[in-house]
Amino acid sequence: KFINLLKRKQITETQRDASIDPFGVNKVGVPSMGGVIIIFAILIPCLLLGKLSNIYMILMLITTIWLGSLGFADDYIKIFKKDKEGLHGKFKIIGQVGLGLIVGLTLYLSPQVVIRENIEIEKPDGQIEVVHAAKEIKATQTTIPFFKSNNFDYADLVGFMGEHAQTAGWILFVIITIFVVTAVSNGANLNDGMDGMAAGNSAIIGLTLGILAYVSSHIEYAGYLNIMYIPGSEELVIFICAFIGALIGFLWYNAYPAQVFMGDTGSLTIGGIIAVYTRNC
């Protein structure tokens, strides 16, 4: 029904990039802006099942709405204003940088965003046991999966600043967050060239990130796998399940031969979601 509505309103593809999709000439007239249904398929389950006071859930919902609106504006200008360039690039960048700044500062300032560090303890027999610290702390650390002694601290990169290294580490964290949000959301936008490409790839990425979020939200699993325990991050699992479900449902109609395209409404949103998700877990 939604696809038929897009057809009736003539919300369709006008031109595809032949360098990305050599079959694009045959897709003129295929409905676009299908990303709208992806956004609603994410938001509705999260609003019904998620804990809306959880800072991680709040950030993911803000990301979905923020970049969804940015992508919608881009598609609207392309389709209804007949301007193939869409929203001017500088406005896209401003929107993405603004979101990255909000996410980075929120993770820095929110008292809900804490971790429990991994601590290595040497046993009497000489073996090393990894345990979690008793107290939760604010830190600029992150875990690099599948590596021994895998805690990476942004503050280490600015250790030359002495007693100000921790604050400088957070500033660096915010800057990198802005870069990641901007780069990944634009990367997903470029990836949306062939039938099913963006939706399929993003669903696989979402599954991987969901597993990492699930493990890091359980203190026993996190300890066993030697990654940081992040209290409250279990809400990210609820969000990513909605994300994957929305993409798989959309993929049914977006796989070759595509009956609908997500447009920038979808591609900017899913790229931003992946970027912000990686900064949360």
Predicted segments with their positions:
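Cytosolic, membrane-interface loops and tails of multi-pass inner-membrane proteins
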Residues: 2-26, 76-85, 135-147
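Alpha-helical transmembrane segments
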Residues: 1-5, 9-10, 38-69, 101-124, ...
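Extracytosolic (periplasmic/ER-lumenal) interhelical loops and adjacent juxtamembrane/interface segments
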Residues: 125-163
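Short juxtamembrane and helix-loop transition motifs at transmembrane-helix boundaries
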Residues: 18-27, 82, 158-166, 223-231, ...
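Individual transmembrane alpha-helix segments
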Residues: 148-179, 185
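Membrane-interfacial loop-to-helix junctions in multi-pass inner-membrane proteins
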Residues: 53-61, 80-95
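Select subsegments of transmembrane alpha-helices in polytopic membrane proteins
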Residues: 27-39, 91-97
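Divalent metal-coordination and catalytic microenvironments
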Residues: 34, 75, 264
